[in-house]
């Protein structure tokens, strides 16, 4: 399984790379200011991940382009934290400031589809962010996949293989995180009930 990791200059990227490596993925890591999306699309990736990062989607280099064009090419793409925000913005959503949350655990509820398949309905996840996706103007092309503490914790594109999570599945504060990443790697973003 060949995976592209877009590194938004964040230390959590290394945790994602480590987990996916342990799960058997062949990973190419590209910094957000060093890749050409057209060339990357031609490299035969099976999956793509847009990593967390300290900036906004507008300052995340190729992240917005990858999170839009890879799913449009049929490549299952996961956005984590900043990547989640980039996914929403790439398809017309709004990212807004939020009270900073760093190293906090929250309980979320989810829809049991795609990366959440087979997990308990209520999950504890680790959060590190100061921006969120605004729910009030979430584009119709998305469905909400998880929520917690009054914040969108996950969104999924209704027709393309693209999903975002505000929390950090690669954090030790997210006990089920590695299982979520394993499901993404093995199943892409195909739900157990056949829907996306």
What are these regions (language model features)?
Residues 43-118, 181-182:
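Cysteine-nucleophile active-site neighborhood
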Residues 159, 164-175:
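Phosphate-binding/catalytic loops
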Residues 17-26:
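Two-component/phosphorelay signaling modules centered on CheY-like receiver
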Residues 114-160:
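Catalytic beta-strand/loop cores that center a nucleophilic Ser/Cys/Thr
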Residues 172-196:
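Acyltransferase
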Residues 35-44:
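Short amphipathic alpha-helix with an adjacent loop that forms part of the alpha/beta core around
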Residues 1-4:
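Extreme N-terminal starter segment of soluble prokaryotic enzymes
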Residues 26-32:
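Short hydrophobic/Thr-rich beta-strand motif most characteristic of the beta2 strand and flanking loop
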């Amino acid at each position: 399984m060949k995976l592209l990791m877009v590194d938004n200059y964040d230390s959590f990227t290394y945790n994602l790379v480590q987990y996916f490596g342990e799960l058997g993925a062949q990973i190419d890591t590209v910094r957000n200011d060093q890749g050409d999306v057209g060339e990357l699309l031609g490299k035969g990736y099976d999956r793509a991940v847009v990593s967390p990062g300290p900036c906004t989607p507008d300052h995340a280099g190729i992240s917005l382009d990858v999170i839009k064009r890879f799913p449009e090419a049929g490549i299952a793409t996961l956005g984590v934290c900043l990547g989640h925000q980039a996914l929403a913005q790439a398809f017309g959503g709004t990212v807004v400031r939020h009270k900073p949350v760093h190293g906090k655990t929250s309980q979320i509820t989810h829809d049991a589809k795609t990366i959440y398949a087979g997990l308990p309905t209520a999950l504890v996840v680790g959060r590190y962010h100061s921006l969120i996706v605004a729910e009030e103007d979430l584009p119709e092309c998305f469905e909400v996949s998880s929520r917690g503490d009054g914040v969108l914790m996950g969104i999924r594109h209704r027709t393309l293989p693209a999903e975002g999570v505000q929390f950090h599945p690669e954090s030790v504060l997210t006990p089920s995180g590695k299982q979520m990443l394993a499901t993404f790697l093995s199943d892409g973003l195909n739900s157990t009930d056949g829907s996306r």
